[in-house]
Design a protein with these regions (language model features):
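Conserved acetyl-CoA-binding loop-helix of GNAT-fold acetyltransferases
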Residues: 74, 80-93
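Conserved beta-strand in the GNAT
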Residues: 47, 52-62, 66-73
Length: 114
């Protein structure tokens, strides 16, 4: 079971979060981290923890009854253990009446982050 923790620059695993963000998403798709850290009511940047272990994060924007997951990444050492699904469950629980939108890409075997 994952625990959701809002991410700030003071987060204990901020360096690891930043590293995962850079490793998981191509530069052309990333936005500045400061934009993800805004926490302005419409945006969320949340880490998932299994006990004390940082597993991954998501970033989402909510407008009305739509929550759009912009970024979701799981530490590569922890993939295929259900953490991605658990992270989606966290989003759904935080927004029980919203439609959840997730953009997904097919794996590209030639991509450097595969």
């Amino acid at each position: 079971m994952l625990t959701a923790v809002p991410i700030t620059t003071d987060s204990k695993d901020f360096k690891e979060i930043k590293h995962l963000y850079i490793a998981a998403f191509p530069k052309s798709e990333r936005v500045p981290l400061r934009d993800l850290l805004r926490h302005d009511g419409a945006s969320e940047f949340v880490a998932g923890y299994d006990g004390e272990t940082f597993c991954g994060f998501y970033s989402a924007l909510t407008f009305g009854d739509i929550t759009h997951i912009l970024f979701l990444a799981i530490d590569e050492r922890l993939r295929a253990h259900g953490y991605g699904s658990a992270m989606l469950d966290i989003v759904a629980a935080a927004h029980p009446h919203n439609r959840i939108i997730v953009d997904a890409e097919a794996e590209d075997p030639a991509a450097s982050n595969n």
